[in-house]
């Protein structure tokens, strides 16, 4: 572990230990929290996480991620009750935490029928009908409908929290005024989520819950309550494991992952073999679907020069913008490329399109609409790199990793560059050297065999996993 990681996980364990007795309905609340958001506004602490001396201010020292994950594995086991009888004729519940599930409508319609599935949502909108049906044709149930008034209980818990904070005034996190406010807010919401989840599970026939993430308190709490009622849980992988912070700790019974990278990574932090299954992701099933628009039409719509090569450049707002400018400067004057800039999450033209005549906006076209008609994809260390390779496209990546970067793309070797000039030269080389194109193709295929083994559709693999985990259910 580097300094940042060691300090981060040590700080996390400080939190778990100090507040372990803060419980509601027998569940230790700190284990359910979204930890990082407890110090969102504590900028000094976030800077100090990279400092060697910061560890001297902490109570705990985490040297092994396995030991950290083990805490949550034991916590989950403590709240798992395999003796509870499930309701007969249970249905699969889909819970889209933080809008990260990303199941395309057509995939959901194909694999999740309304007689066997439903959607769990948090709150109702102002115009939500009493019994709403989603765009996929599935009934929706709202956790807020199963809530109760527990103000007195919340006040008692928050009073307990205040007493603990008073004892740890000198701690770099607990002693900061923004921590108490953030933690109290999560305490209240988690207590309500425990009530909502318990009441919903008691009243609805649920055979399995599929999550988009268990990183957030909303979904993590539901997953633990589900374990108490012997309901199996599956957590989909919503993006590449770029930063380990987004995937630790593991909470669901099974994490449905993209490929062998994640299997090996989860094993490295002590997760058992049966806790991880290679499923892929249902949205990727649409990547190689027949193009929805012709190249001629796209060329006209985007104002491309049909004689030039098309490069798709993936950016994220103004992140790394100085690097992208250097990249485009290298191509300025070459008069060989159309550079289509696709920003995320914005749909408006990126500022870079104003500075370079050969750079154009993607005009909101979906990634999978663009991929069939580009020659090369250039991106930062994002999931788009994997998606483009699944589409059979050469991918060249700019590497500016976070302190918790997992090394996901390391197997691509020189196709990943730290400097924009080197990245630009690599793309130039790809277009002029047949030998280099063959090398890139070989690297990409080997990478995909490890990162995304495409045996059968992900949607089908997920349905088979659900069937395996709910085997024997349906008996009263």
Model-inferred region functions:
Residues 90-95, 186, 198-216, 312, ...:
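Short N-terminal targeting/anchoring amphipathic segment
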